[in-house]
């Protein structure tokens, strides 16, 4: 399979040295993303595109390659092509007939040729000749340029002919690793996950910072969605997941700060903490999922007071977004189900939160706060490589994995319903129950406690996360099913 990758248009208008650096980085990222599927993958580039060639013929693996590239920042779209030496017009007709002839009978079609290089003919000459011959030879109903039923697409580049089978859209943006890094404050909800995605899509390496307000289940949930975002959209680069224990900070706020200023104070403490982490990692910008006036702490006066807690640049990609638009994008990128079932901890709830915090009043309230509490929390922060968050879980609770299910055991398929439908898990003589990952924590308690359950997912990532959580909740009848 050969793919022609068209790079993000904004890359092509950069200076030659910058353009070469960005395209070289994109090529490196593509190799990183696909190397486990094809260690021999070839990636070569020219000024506005890259050619990706794999000798893997397994259609399932090819589909996985295509899926990963559609989620790789830096790619506008890519073409699935067959490549040939450029012959005369009749040879082009023969190649097009071979690939499209069976689709043209009784159909209205069009030919689109894109050409680059020095030739004694134009793209329009190719369109007319190939279209005329295909109409005569394939029994087509006619040529329709505006809304063709079948589109025959070819590219000619110097002395090479490319017959295009499919075009797959990418997410655009710059290649990860070509721009700067950011640190996103993650709660695991709709807003923070979409904000993180938008930074990654633009091409910024995005590390994750979670302030744990007192719930292990919440921490596991945020680990899970952060790992998902990285794996799907950013796995070409290694980033960190930082977890900061904020229980004492919350307690100090509840005891020392006036009720109306609790929410704003908590946000300021989080920004201070995130800025401290960013300094350690030499990161210049923080990212939050805040939108104007979505909640009381997000009015413009309050955001101004919150931002004054740090000199760091605070990016808010969702600032002017409507909530439904955010939810729609979360659904599109695959984080909505995580957000809907994310465990919540609401330890700081103001009865009458201020919507117009005053600077002098904020200074007064923070004077009551013992900053040593914040410093202790930051000292206990955990820095975990995002690809090792699953390994981290096994340090406090042993998670048993089995390669074979035994009669009497129940395998719970926790994959997304779409994956369950596409590739149903069928095990002879073994009961299999479908229970998506986002529902298992709430539904597991209703299962028969005398039975033994094996959690299954494709990679073993989500199954280990949820097995860890269930074991920590006291459910000893849980294992992970990892067939060989």
UniProtKB/Swiss-Prot annotation:
Subcellular location: Cytoplasm
Amino acids binding ATP: 185-186, 267, 289, 298
Start and end residues of each Rhodanese domain: 405-483
Keyword Transferase: yes
A single GO molecular function term of this UniProt record: CCA tRNA nucleotidyltransferase activity
Active site: 457 (cysteine persulfide intermediate)
Reactions the enzyme catalyzes: [ThiI sulfur-carrier protein]-S-sulfanyl-L-cysteine + a uridine in tRNA + 2 reduced [2Fe-2S]-[ferredoxin] + ATP + H(+) = [ThiI sulfur-carrier protein]-L-cysteine + a 4-thiouridine in tRNA + 2 oxidized [2Fe-2S]-[ferredoxin] + AMP + diphosphate; [ThiS sulfur-carrier protein]-C-terminal Gly-Gly-AMP + S-sulfanyl-L-cysteinyl-[cysteine desulfurase] + AH2 = [ThiS sulfur-carrier protein]-C-terminal-Gly-aminoethanethioate + L-cysteinyl-[cysteine desulfurase] + A + AMP + 2 H(+)
Protein name, entry field: tRNA sulfurtransferase
Source species taxonomy: Bacteria, Pseudomonadati, Pseudomonadota, Gammaproteobacteria, Pseudomonadales
Gene field: thiI
